[in-house]
Amino acid sequence: MRINILNILAGLAILTLLTFLKVHLNGNEEFSIAEELFSKNNYAKATTHYERAIQWHIPGSSTPTLAAEKLWHISLFYESKNQTNEALKTCRLLRGAFYSTRSFFTPGKKWINLCNEKVAHWMASKPDLINEAPLSFESRKNKFLNNLQADRSPYT
């Protein structure tokens, strides 16, 4: 009986290790593809692969952080070129990638908070078509920021 329990525990440990290895390798592969696309200035496709690299998140891996940095720089690049919609899309991808890996904890809170600030700013910069008496920029920014920062549990 004792040997059966040890065999079961050993099997579970091996399966867990192999799962972590697969997640780590797939994250690195997605990051490599993204880096290649980024070097060719194909930012649209690179953002997809950086997002996937973040979604292959395991605690202790540096790949999601490196991918997040790249996505952040791409969004700032778009902002500098006055391509606000692309910057907004990239920032939302970055934010959403970390939220999609959420379970007992939320990884990438630093990046989520940075994205919340930027998204609120960009959204508030757009014309206010909803309110009869348009709100001030700061009022709209705070409204968007409060909405983005609201803690919502993951859908199950």
Regions found by a protein language model. Give the residues of each.
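Hydrophobic/aromatic side-chain positions at a characteristic register within alpha-helices
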Residues: 26, 31, 38-39, 79
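Conserved small-residue packing positions in alpha-helical repeats and bundles
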Residues: 27, 34-35, 68, 72-75, ...
